[in-house]
Amino acid sequence: MNLKEMGKNAKQAATILAQLSQQQKNTALQIIAEQLELQSNKILVENAKDIQLAKENGLSDAIIDRLLLTKERINSIANDVRHIISLPDPIGQIIDGGILESGTKLERVRVPLGVIGVIYEARPNVTVDVATLCLKTGNAVILRGGKETSYSNKILVTVIQDALEQTGLPKNAVQAITDPDRNFVLELLKLDKYVDMIIPRGGAGLHEFCKQNSTIPVIIGGVGVCHVFVEESAEQDKALAVIDNAKTQRPSTCNTLETLLVQESIATEFLPKLVAHLKHKNVKYHADPTALSILEKQNAEVSIVQEQQLRQEWGSLDLNVVIVKDIQQAIAHITEYGTQHSEAILTSSPRLAHQFVSLVDAAAVYVNASTRFTDGGQFGLGAEVAVSTQKLHARGPMGLEALTTYKWVCSGDYTVRQ
């Protein structure tokens, strides 16, 4: 596998994509959506191979859930592509501008980034999400999925490339590194002659590896140690529903609740209600000493929480429970252990809600809502390429605009600077 050749081909494809009209790009996306559904049986056969290997290798249920494709999930992915078609094309958008003192017309115009490298783990849906978002924004993409999704990724990329060729577009607009050798990841991270941005989607180890080794700008994000703080004025029955949703709806996602913070003044009243509410959800609790004594009396499956577990993205039905004295202690805990992803407060106090929003440093902050909303589709951005937890270039779910940059376009009448 020649990565330099792959990079060169991607750069050439990006030049073609940058010139396409919105209609040309949308036509290609429509065919991709149709082919995903038409080829779903082939996709499921290949996905079953990944699932079988995952089980043989003893991977967790959480990882297998990320790997799994079903007819329903493929249809959902295809519908996400159709939603991207319906979104306005940001390319060519005039962000701002005006007439300069010299009479020259100046405009700031949105343009594609060029070539994007995306490194991700056990999520085959990311293959389609990323490829179609990049195509919509006129970017070429080099994908490197995890070895756990090898069969699924190969068939998905083949379906996408075939659809591109049907519309006369270069199939090299979407390419994949299929060799599991990690040296190819390292080589991709050094391919700054051709690649304009690297987006890692995976655990903290992957992000750190990319930060340490890349000569290309890296978007960091996706690691979600998310908190919900139940403040003493919260409506408790409604709070239980939010916690249930944030923890159990799909535990393997990065916007799932990992640590519940409960104000001390309501802990003895609220925690028994929590256990009763979640009793059929197979939640395992990891609690501080105060919470432990309360939860044990409810016959909950509970153990003492270890310090390192407070920094852990469980990706499962494990839940940390910590008692805090007040909002200041809750914010301090989030500052120490959070990953700047998604944080929530449940409260009836507008003043405390404002304080929480102002002081918590995260890409998304919620008042009386589940952290599960941190998602490109939920935010109306279409499928997301990643959730950025950094502050430069993009923050939060990265939709179409996050895959663009801008250039200054200056138009004069043979104007010279005086």
Swiss-Prot record:
The keyword Transport does not apply. The lineage of its organism: Bacteria, Pseudomonadati, Pseudomonadota, Gammaproteobacteria, Pasteurellales. Keywords: Amino-acid biosynthesis, Cytoplasm, NADP, Oxidoreductase, Proline biosynthesis. SUPFAM superfamilies: ALDH-like. The gene is proA. This is Gamma-glutamyl phosphate reductase. Pathway: Amino-acid biosynthesis; L-proline biosynthesis; L-glutamate 5-semialdehyde from L-glutamate: step 2/2. It catalyses: L-glutamate 5-semialdehyde + phosphate + NADP(+) = L-glutamyl 5-phosphate + NADPH + H(+). One of its GO terms (cellular component) is cytoplasm. Its main location: cytoplasm. It comes from Histophilus somni (strain 129Pt).
